[in-house]
Amino acid sequence: MKRAYNFNAGPSAMPLEVLLEAQEEFLNYKNTGMSIIEMSHRSNEYAALHAETKKLLRELMEIPEDYEIMFIQGGGSTQFLMTAANFHTKKYAAYVNTGVWAKKAMAEGKFYGEVYEAASSADKNHSYIPQEFTLRPDTSYVHLTANNTIYGTEYKDFPKFDVPVICDMSSDILSRKVNVKDFDLIYAGAQKNLGPAGVVIVIVKKSFLATAREDLPTMLKYSTFANNDSLYNTPPVFAIYMVNKTLHWIKKQGGVNAIAKNNAAKAKLIYDVIDNSDGFYKGHAAPEARSNMNITFNLATPEMEKDFVAKGKAAGFIGIGGHRLVGGCRASAYNAVPLEACKALAEFMEEYMKENK
């Protein structure tokens, strides 16, 4: 079976090894005579899977014991709401505006109080990561977006603040090593580097969690999930099962450092073509802010970009069109995208340039 070169921005490529394992045991999970999707979330088999998934995540990310790990439904967009609902307890909440997803988070924050931009990269169409920040007194938290899928930028070093830091890591979690202790809350939708859509990983410092509001509907309170081991209601069992498989795969590759090394090599293949194209391909992100996850670039005209995407699709490259809001082209090289796929795309880009220069 020939597999597509999958550069979709999310849901995105998953390790073939993981898919094959899931296929093999789909009808009979651990000799129970049942599929994992048929089993009670109160069963011993699922309880073991649930606990192991948290343990693997804690090990791979080096999450300290004073941090809670939760599995929540609703996607990253619901986290825009939940973070503000629980923690916007002072006069202001601050957001660093590095693109569409940061702005969406900020829009949800407005439902719970005043918000403001601590910094913004909008002046240059979000092609860089701000380095200077202004915080007002009485600020509840600062919200960061670690990686910007649409514009192809990411923080190389995270800034330090004197207020709690909340970070959306949906598109780069486990792609590189981060110091969890630098954050009070991290959230990440699974559908880019962790598994399929359907579950969000939330990592929160217990002392920060203790400051959350409790006068909220049950399913909007983080304490509901923390106090019930994310089992207050039926969790997204299959999504968590696939996250478990993916975490095992990451560990087998050598852990986060090995994954990060491979990701840097993959991105370099494509950025090198862009940089050596004499302007045929124009990278959107400033070199010092380039994402290893989402490589964004433009060609001379929108018509040429459409032709590039169409010919790329015919050659087996899926998902290389830019986001509908900004156009252009984008290759999303998440953890599970193999090096061979990036080599093939780089070769296709070279060939297309020769034919159209």
Predicted region positions:
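Conserved active-site segment immediately N-terminal to the catalytic lysine
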Residues: 166, 180-191, 200
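PLP-dependent enzyme catalytic core of the Aspartate aminotransferase-like
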Residues: 3-4, 314, 327-357
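Active-site phosphate-binding strand-loop segment of PLP-dependent enzymes
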Residues: 10, 109, 121-173
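Conserved N-terminal alpha-helix of the aminotransferase class I/II PLP-enzyme fold
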Residues: 32-79, 86, 100, 108
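Conserved PLP-binding catalytic core of the aspartate aminotransferase-like
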Residues: 281-312
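Active-site C-terminal subdomain of aminotransferase-like
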Residues: 15, 190-271, 286, 355-357
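PLP-dependent aminotransferase-like
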Residues: 77-142
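A glycine-/small-polar-enriched, mobile loop at the entrance of the PLP active site in fold-type I
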Residues: 3-54
